A protein has these predicted regions:
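Short, conserved catalytic/metal-binding motifs centered on acidic residues
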Residues: 32, 43, 81
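Intrinsically disordered, low-complexity segments enriched in polar/charged residues with Gly/Pro
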Residues: 7-10, 30, 58-59, 65-68
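Short, positively charged, Gly/Tyr-enriched micro-motifs
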Residues: 47-50, 59-118
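Long C-terminal interaction/binding lobes of large macromolecular proteins
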Residues: 1-31, 36
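Short, flexible, mixed-charge glycine/proline-rich loop motifs
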Residues: 30-40, 69-76
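Cys/His-rich Zn2+-binding cysteine-cluster or related metal-binding knuckle/ribbon modules and their
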Residues: 36, 40, 53, 57-60
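Solvent-exposed beta-strand/loop surfaces of large extracellular or lumenal domains
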Residues: 12, 17, 52-58
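Extended Gly/Ser/Thr-rich low-complexity repeat segments
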Residues: 38, 42-48
Length: 118
């Protein structure tokens, strides 16, 4: 996927491999729907090249925009290991957007820490 269509919205994240698919304006918040560029991924257990196995929606809290809360709905990839002898059958994508099982984006955490230090 190219940034040609989503370039202005993608620039807000400042992450080159995150694409903004939609921005939804609710009554009290913005929801930004994103997904990442699919890299080649090896199984974390056996290092065999994994294949895509669908997506899971992960809701993250991000920085507010113009005083309005922002949520990020990340269409996180699920991968499947093709090695029969491997003890891991599926695993999820890791990305700098958020920590594993995190509820905040990494930039929201950095902003909050900076606010506490100032």
């Amino acid at each position: 996927m190219s940034h040609a269509i989503c370039a202005p919205a993608c620039a807000l994240f400042d992450l080159p491999d995150v694409h903004v698919l939609a921005v939804e304006r609710g009554a009290r918040q913005f929801t930004v729907v994103v997904e990442t560029v699919p890299p080649l991924v090896g199984c974390p257990s056996c290092a065999v090249l994994a294949t895509g196995h669908g997506r899971r929606k992960v809701l993250l809290h991000d920085l507010p925009c113009a005083g309005v809360p922002v949520r990020v709905r990340w269409r996180k990839r699920i991968y499947r290991c093709l090695e029969d002898a491997c003890e891991i059958s599926t695993f999820s994508e890791l990305h700098e957007l958020a920590a594993p099982r995190g509820k905040l984006t990494t930039r929201a955490i950095a902003w909050a820490v900076a606010q506490l230090r100032s």
